[in-house]
Amino acid sequence: DPVWATLEVGGIGQDGRHMVTKTDYRFLHTLENMGPSPEPNMTVLYAPRLPENFKKYCAHISVATSSIQYENDEVMRPVWGDDYSICCCVSATQTGKEMQFFGARANLAKALLYAINGGWDLKHQEQVAPNTGRIETEYLDYDQVQEKFDLTMEWLAGLYVNTLNLIHYMHDKYYYEASQMALIDTNVRRTFATGIAGFSHVVDSLCAIRYAKVKVIRDENGYAADFQVEGDFPRYGNDDDRADTIAVWLLRTFLEKIKHYHTYRDSEPTTSILTITSNVVYGKYTGNMPDGRRAWTPLAPGANPSYGAEQSGLIASLNSVAKLPYQYALDGISNTQTINPGALGHSDRERTENLVNILDGYFSRGAHHLNVNVFGKEMLVDAMEHPEKPEYQNFTIRVSGYAVKFIDLTREQQLDVISRTCHETL
């Protein structure tokens, strides 16, 4: 199991000078001379104005090992200064001056289904959320769905925050980390982390309801059990503002609702779009969605577009994610992309140069985070079927904010990784 140790290299100082050292190169080089490793979670604090040779070396290591995540120093530095660390997966924190109350995530995809069904849970066949009145019409109306979804999110935010308040209070009571807190300044800044799961499915579902016609298929009790989409609709992940503006609205709205509630020890509420591998578990309890996602299957991870939604290539997908403002998700916006080596170029040098150009463009648009995997799906399938092969004993992949040995994942998690989009074109 991960110990969540993260190592940061690179970054730009407040005075404008880069902070790349020879030791940064040495740390990165261990991934070549000692082999890929999930931990420490190797994180490059990226900025387009970092030394060109350093950016190329990072890209070279990414292509060779798929073991690096990149985070945008240009958006984090104004918030956290130039002496910050990455905790857990992608969350920035001022080193030695603050701590974070970890908050897992809320399943907004299931919340949307609650809104449609008046709070009724199809999985457990019981009333869970407040009964706002189920939608009885044959086709879903966008304004009606959004109104009920807004009420459901308000209820969920309150339940979420108050549950976390209880957890953090009891944790401090019975398991206060005194030795760790001794290393932090006396006047501690505390942040209250929350998170979002099912993000892209909610965005695509709202797009389907707004721009196409979504017919409701009901069960024997009259609840919406499935949906039939008539017509085309924009999907998040294709650089289409019709979908991407809904994505920004969803992130901003949920954070605003979180801020309506008192947080433990007056900590500052933040949120993230980060699921690690919990997207598989959340999916087991989430029914059919209006975007076409089937019941009980994994949700798309983090801020990634839904599986199969990206139809316009890698660059368009990155542009969509880059539109999500970091200020609304200071706990992190995790984006994991898998690129076929042939899509990046026909030689190591070409792949390295193209990846640097992709990173420069992506982060110059204000994006926060990127996991880079460079391999084809056939390699994943072979590793799943033949984990005993020597070449797979240390086969490391980026998942969602952290790295893991592929053969250490459960088969269910491996199948989820395999089902994710592998970009064949830029």
Question: Where would I find each of the regions flagged by the language model?
Answer:
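Conserved catalytic cores of very large enzyme subunits
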Residues: 1-426
